[in-house]
């Protein structure tokens, strides 16, 4: 929290030369900050520390001002696939403060994120190796989260059909879907990111 600048940005701001096995550049990447937003929400839920509300409000104003020039995919593709984590935090804060600019930001995040509605409609979830399995876990919820702002039934339908396809084409006996890095069908022998996908799939739902 002490790293937050006057414009609302927070976290590391300096890039370093490359080093094998480490990501030392892209310090302004949107995605790592989405992880921190979830932590801040949980901290507020435990403490009611009002500094969290001020902190997140400033950061979301920074996002609204900066995303038009440096969209979610500017530094890496992770933020496009995992924007749901950002979106749910925006709506969480909106439900506490009622600040109208948060809905504007929510719409912008949705526009810049990977379209899971299109993914489902293309039938991508009926094939193998079409998406990174953790991106799927974090992103499949985005349409139903955005439905809180735009009640077009296509968002509900896409999530329902998406989970149906996942169960039919990738479902496994333990209740999760087959995927180590990419979706790999319902063969139970390859390893799966079970713990991570279970956590991320549940989080925003």
Predicted regions and their residues:
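Active-site-adjacent substrate/metal-binding segments within catalytic domains
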Residues: 2-45
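Short, solvent-exposed turn/loop segments enriched in Gly/Ser/Thr/Pro and often Arg
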Residues: 8-18, 55, 75-86, 174-184
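A conserved hydrophobic secondary-structure block that centers on an alpha-helix together
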Residues: 27-92
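Structural helix-adjacent loops and short alpha-helical linkers that scaffold large soluble proteins
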Residues: 43-57, 94-107, 147-160
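Conserved small/polar residues in nucleotide/adenosyl-binding loops
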Residues: 194-201
